[in-house]
Regions:
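Loop/turn positions that initiate beta-strands
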Residues: 1, 82-83
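Boundary regions of SH3-family modules and the immediately adjacent low-complexity/disordered segments
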Residues: 1-24
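Short, Lys/Arg- and Gly-enriched loop/turn segments at beta-strand edges
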Residues: 1-2, 92-98
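Aromatic- and glycine-rich peptidoglycan recognition patches
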Residues: 6-8, 36, 72, 96, ...
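Catalytic cysteine-centered active-site loop
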Residues: 30-81
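Short acidic loop-to-beta-strand element that houses the catalytic metal-binding Asp/Glu
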Residues: 84, 99
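Short, surface-exposed secondary-structure boundary micro-motifs
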Residues: 87-90
Length: 144
């Protein structure tokens, strides 16, 4: 697990509070590569900022975040709320995207393909973007 920092965080470091922050604080955020604020962020910026608000330090980039915490498996059905989900659109499997699991195959993330903030149901077979995202899933990490 990733340790909370010794500075006072704005919010409690529990899964319900973290998933609420991810859904509410960043709702409407536009995609901005390298951004870390509700006025513009990318996928890993969202993850880093949300967890930082709760006193949990994570690295900046998705590929670095993929090394944080502990293995939570490769089965989307088994992921729990608060887990980080990692994806790749590269043949070599290098991590290129991260999302926060809300449980029950739901995620919150910032995606260029969605123009920014998005809540997704990864079992929505009618949505082409979701089908592609699900096919790109690599693994999950537990950081709580």
């Amino acid at each position: 697990m990733v340790a909370a920092t010794d500075r006072t965080s704005m919010f409690p470091a529990d899964v319900d509070a973290i998933t609420r922050t991810a859904q509410r604080y960043f709702e409407g955020t536009s995609y901005l590569w390298g951004g870390v604020t509700p006025w513009g962020a990318d996928c890993s910026g969202l993850v880093q900022s949300v967890f930082a608000l709760h006193g949990i330090d994570l690295p900046r980039d998705a590929w670095q975040q993929a090394r944080a915490g502990s293995d939570a498996g490769r089965d989307l059905l088994a992921t729990r709320a608060g887990d980080l989900l990692f994806f790749s659109d590269r043949a070599d499997g290098h991590v290129t995207h991260v999302a926060i699991s809300l449980g029950s195959r739901r995620v919150v993330h910032l995606a260029l393909g969605r123009g920014g903030y998005a809540l997704e149901r990864l079992d929505d077979a009618s949505d082409e973007y979701v089908r592609k995202l699900e096919a790109r899933f690599l693994f999950a990490r537990a950081v709580l």
